[in-house]
Regions:
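A structural signal for multi-pass alpha-helical bundles of membrane permease subunits
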Residues: 4-9, 14, 18, 22-313
Length: 313
């Protein structure tokens, strides 16, 4: 009596075929998802070059191509309600826009840069302290910060606004910087995890040589932390750059203090949408360019073995 042995070659071939079919199915699903995700972006870019006005455009590709939508963005600096009969808009040339887009760009850049610098510094210092220092109630403090970070910031928006009004910072760009930076320390988790990977022996060796904790952080640890610095800087820059919620509450009614997100939303009001929709598309494309360039330049720092071989055996 003989026992039939399984054909290993056939089994491997069958497994390879199944894996190939599964991979093809996955690629098809991913391709469909990419198309769904990228279609609105491509459409927005095309409409930013559209020479026609209106929202309900009949074709995906513009019938007439023009750069005028981008030029119009910077042809007017500040204006009152375009539906007001006394508005200066009625005396403007027809190719000028009733929205101070240039001012919005400047406001957004100022708020985003200062918020980024302050928030990055706070996050790095808090994360390093929690990574290296051992003190009473340390874990409780970390858990408390984690729980607080789960609550969305807009829950305290009204209270923060009232406080800013009381201290005389209502409708000021500086108040936005304070709001975006004040809760930065709660985002310590990722940076702390990175600092945990840097060997403590570096700190100990520096202490033996007479370095203070402050010198260790600035001179030794930070130069080894480019990836987390870049990550933190990008995330803290992107938040204020694209935020709408806080700006809409803090700066409502003063279009000279708007950031781009708030300003672009104003273009989509029923009374202005038809006239300025393609210009809105141009503004949306333009505001995405700095972030795209910034990420493209700095993404190489994301993958770096900065701690590999830092401690010699």
């Amino acid at each position: 009596m003989t026992t039939k042995q399984p054909n290993i070659g056939n089994m491997q071939a069958g497994y390879a075929k199944q894996r190939k079919i599964a991979n093809i199915a996955v690629y098809i699903i991913l391709s469909i998802m990419v198309v769904i995700w990228i279609f609105p972006i491509v459409w927005l870019v095309f409409q930013s070059f559209n020479g026609e006005k209106g929202v309900a455009l009949a074709t995906f590709f513009p019938k007439t191509w023009t750069f005028d939508n981008y030029i119009k963005l910077f042809r007017q600096e500040g204006l009152s309600d375009p539906m007001d009969p006394t508005s200066p808009m009625i005396v403007l040339p027809v190719d000028r826009m009733p929205f101070p887009y240039g001012r919005w760009i400047t406001n957004t850049f100022i708020v985003a840069v200062f918020s980024c610098l302050i928030s990055t510094l706070i996050i790095l210092m808090v994360s390093y302290a929690l990574s290296r220092l051992r003190f009473k109630s340390r874990k409780m403090l970390m858990n408390f910060g984690l729980i607080l970070g789960m609550f969305p910031g807009f829950m305290s928006m009204a209270a923060i606004y009232n406080i800013m009004e009381i201290i005389g910072l209502g409708k000021q760009l500086f108040s936005l910087v304070i709001v975006y930076s004040s809760g930065a320390g709660l985002g310590y988790q990722i940076a702390k995890g990175f600092f945990d990977t840097i060997p403590r022996s570096l700190d100990e060796a520096a202490k033996i040589d007479g370095a203070t904790r402050n010198q260790i952080f600035w001179i030794i640890i930070l130069p080894l932390s480019k990836p987390i610095i870049v990550y933190t800087a990008l995330t803290t820059f992107l938040g204020p750059w694209a935020d709408y919620v806080f700006v809409s509450y803090f700066m409502k009614g003063d279009d000279q203090k708007y950031t781009v997100a708030m300003g672009l939303y104003e273009m989509l009001k029923p009374e202005t949408m038809h006239e300025w929709f393609t210009v809105f598309c141009a503004g949306a494309v333009l505001i995405a360019v700095p972030i795209t360039i910034l990420f493209t330049i700095m993404q190489r720092f994301y993958v770096a073995g900065v701690t590999g071989g830092a401690v010699k055996g």
